[in-house]
A protein has these predicted regions:
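Short, structured "edge-of-domain" segments at secondary-structure transitions
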Residues: 1-343
Length: 343
């Protein structure tokens, strides 16, 4: 959150059984925490989106490759941030590939779709990407083909899945429309695509998580309250991150506020229903909590590892793990009208 960045090769972290503590991934100060974890090639562009609705970019090779214990370099050494401006989201884009759209989502549930070609010629001082309401910020940017299904996930375990055609393509500097109707005190924690045959992996702040096929989530119209994606309680903590798994993804990495990383096989994560709580994925230290997830497949790695299968530990199963999908569907009157944010 204080604006440091770095890169490491994935095989810095060997696969572990789920439920472990992990190992050091990034040095942080007491008043700092890890915010983004993602996979990239050194030839890709890293697009940095800020709390002021701007985007700047640099080549991934400009990010320092350092050890897990190192903090990295300040982003201000790589791109032209304004005083007190903070990076809230990072998107990795292949060089020269300007097809499709970018769909933005904010912490307060606003969404917007813009042609990626609008960002083909980024100036050194960046470009305006979205007009934001006071106190809101861009949390996620998903690249789409124009025919994709997308989903928002909230801290209280709600999710809404909708087709991107529900969103008209708008100009680069325009505001957003309502993606999900949030209860008071709730906020969006993840915005992900829903690939055919894929699944949603989500995790609570205390390291409890699960995997649910996207087929368990019905397609809705944007703007409603959504359906229950996870049951939460004091043991699970609030949902803090979610990632969309494709059939090609083999590995999952989770990182905590204090920079501890664990890498495991996707197949180790139990597949269960929407209203289940899940199993222990990671065991954060006292005072620490999980903050981010990332998934990747063999194409992202320089090697392929095969580990022995992990048996399900009965002590890690939580009450309510029946996987019953019958509860908590939102009613039809939860669908909201478009809310346009005036520039």
């Amino acid at each position: 959150e204080r604006g440091y960045t770095k890169r490491m090769v994935p095989d810095t972290y060997v696969q572990q059984s789920r439920g472990g503590r992990g190992r050091r991934g990034m040095a942080t100060r007491d008043d700092d925490r890890v915010k983004v974890l993602t996979l990239a090639s050194t030839h890709d562009w890293a697009m940095f989106f800020t709390d002021r609705g701007r985007v700047l970019r640099t080549r991934v090779w400009n990010l320092p490759e350092v050890s897990p214990a190192a903090r990295g370099t300040s982003i201000v050494n790589l791109v032209s941030l304004e005083p007190d401006e903070k990076v809230t989201c990072v998107l990795i884009v292949r060089d020269g590939d300007m097809s499709g759209n970018l769909v933005f989502a904010t912490r307060r549930g606003e969404i917007k779709r813009t042609a990626i070609s609008d960002f083909a010629h980024l100036r050194q001082n960046g470009l305006k990407t979205m007009d934001l309401e006071e106190g809101d910020e861009i949390g996620w940017v998903v690249r789409t083909s124009g025919n994709d299904r997308l989903a928002l996930v909230t801290a209280r375990g709600m999710s809404i899945s909708f087709h991107e055609s529900d969103l008209r393509v708008s100009g680069r500097t325009s505001g957003g429309v309502r993606g999900i109707r949030l209860d008071e005190g709730d906020e969006v924690v993840s915005f992900v695509p829903c690939p055919p045959g894929g699944s949603l992996v989500l995790i609570g702040q205390n390291g409890i998580g699960k995997q649910t096929p996207w087929s368990r989530f019905r397609l809705q119209t944007r703007g409603g309250k959504g359906v229950r994606a996870a049951a939460i309680n004091d043991r699970t903590g609030s949902i803090v991150a979610a990632v969309s798994i494709t059939p090609e993804d083999t590995d999952l990495m989770a990182i905590t506020r204090n920079g501890i990383v664990i890498r495991m096989q996707v197949s180790d994560i139990r597949v269960c229903g929407r209203v289940a709580r899940g199993v222990r994925i990671m065991r954060p230290d006292a005072g620490d909590e999980v903050v981010a997830l990332s998934a990747f497949g063999p194409d992202n790695l320089d090697f392929v590892e095969v580990s022995a299968p992990v048996e399900l530990d009965p002590e890690d199963l939580l009450e309510g793990d029946s996987g019953d999908d019958s509860a908590d569907d939102a009613s039809a009157d939860d669908v909201a009208e478009d809310v346009t944010v005036t520039p």
